[in-house]
Amino acid sequence: MALATPLPATQAAVKVTGPSTVDVSAATTLPVLEAFEVLVRVACVSINHVDGKSADMSPTPGATSGVDFSGLIVALGSKVDSDEFRANNNMRALSIGDRVFGGVFGNNPLRHDNGAFAEYVAVPARLIWHMPAAMDFSTAATIGATLATVGLALFQYLQVPMPSTQTISDSKTIPDPQQKTRMALVYGGGTATGAMAIQVLKLAGFRPITTCSPGSAARAMHLGAAATFDYRSPTCGADLREHTANGLELALDCITDTASMSICYEALGSAGGRYVALDAFPLRGHTRRSVAAEWVCTYTQFGHAVAWVPPYNLDARPRDREIAEAWYVVAQQLVDEGLIEPYPKEDRTGGLAAVGEGMRAVWKGEISGRKLAYPIAEECY
């Protein structure tokens, strides 16, 4: 293992202590670094809805919480340098001192020592992004989970063709006129994941349409939505079907409740299509046999089982890992070329000690239209 400097014997980390409760442990172990992982000194973290939700519905006492992070690489696993994946895909090699960002599996029953809300986090070397020179740690910490989730949802579960690094360089979109006219619905375009999905769909050559509040419509259009629809309208589903001439085939549901599922199903054309949710959807909402319905758990990208309570107990999905690795290559280019616009954020103080309060606020729905970011290590800035 290559090290920047000697590592401390212990670290501070936000630990799950019970249902919906977390606390900072001042002296817990660092993650055990696996051969194909890098160890990151966490500079900044951000809060996702899943952080509080998972601590509520499937708490793992003693597990480190948190998904999104940015920071500096301080150690390389024993096989990182010999892995040719990044070189074969024209990605920068990972080196000690590199500025990076991404997401990990926090509150993991199978790995208590690893999560983003800590001073150090271990990350697969193939599933981490370099930060562009002009990007700050706070912004980078808000991107990882949404970028990974959208990639897996679109290119694995909705089966959207993934753009290659070459097609991005050539035209910034897939150069297929028919593909460019194909529409896809993003339900919840005002959310962080919805905003990311709109951008990625447009870059993949689609015409994204979205549901959102009137207050979020202008931003959705700015990001690339071809049209927006007020999800509160009683005719929202019918309006979507009319707008798409009864031909809509793809719907990504970033909200996932009975109301959102009903509108998506009404919007999909009479020939059916694919519906992908970002959570386990209510089975009573699956009302059309012509619609293939699936849901995404981004943690399957790591290639291991998810050992939460049902329905979140999932076997390992090797194909998800394959798609994720391919997507990280493409996404790195999108980030490098400034083609991804980050979601609005609010920088907060207090470090790890304040993260628990932010988790609760996001989980309770008290935060809207922005992500909360918390600097952790001032020496990284």
UniProtKB/Swiss-Prot annotation:
GO molecular-function terms, A-Z? nucleotide binding; oxidoreductase activity, acting on NAD(P)H; polyketide synthase activity
| Species per Swiss-Prot/TrEMBL record | Neonectria sp. (strain DH2)
UniProt keyword terms in alphabetical order = NADP, Nucleotide-binding, Oxidoreductase
One Gene Ontology BP term is: ilicicolin H biosynthetic process
Name of the protein in its database record: Trans-enoyl reductase iliB
Q: SUPFAM superfamilies recorded for this chain?
A: GroES-like, NAD(P)-binding Rossmann-fold domains
Pfam families referenced in this protein's UniProt entry, alphabetically: ADH_N, ADH_zinc_N
Per its UniProt record, what PANTHER family does this chain match?
Answer: HYPOTHETICAL OXIDOREDUCTASE (EUROFUNG), TRANS-ENOYL REDUCTASE APDC
Family under the similarity heading? Belongs to the zinc-containing alcohol dehydrogenase family.
Q: What broad taxonomic lineage does this protein's source fall under?
A: Eukaryota, Fungi, Dikarya, Ascomycota, Pezizomycotina
Report the EC number(s), separated by commas if there are several.
1.-.-.-
* Catalysed reactions, semicolon-separated: N-[(4E,6E,10S,12Z,14E)-6,10-dimethyl-3-oxohexadeca-4,6,12,14-tetraenoyl]-L-tyrosyl-[ACP] = (3E,5S)-3-[(2E,4E,8S,10E,12Z)-1-hydroxy-4,8-dimethyltetradeca-2,4,10,12-tetraen-1-ylidene]-5-[(4-hydroxyphenyl)methyl]pyrrolidine-2,4-dione + holo-[ACP] + H(+)
Physiological role: Trans-enoyl reductase; part of the gene cluster that mediates the biosynthesis of ilicicolin H, a 4-hydroxy-2-pyridonealkaloid that has potent and broad antifungal activities by inhibiting the mitochondrial respiration chain. IliB collaborates with the hybrid PKS-NRPS synthetase iliA to assemble the backbone of ilicicolin H. The PKS portion of iliA and trans-acting enoyl reductase iliB work together to construct an octaketide, and two methyl groups are introduced by the MT domain of iliA during the chain assembly.
Annotated binding of substrate, by residue: A145, T146, L147, A148, T149, V150, G151, L152, T298, Y299, T300, Q301, F302
User: Gene of origin?
Assistant: iliB
Residues that coordinate or bind NADP(+): V50, D51, G52, K53, S213, P214, G215, S216, Y231, L278, D279, I367, S368
InterPro entries from the entry? ADH-like_C, ADH-like_N, GroES-like_sf, NAD(P)-bd_dom_sf, PKS_ER, Trans-enoyl_RdTase-like
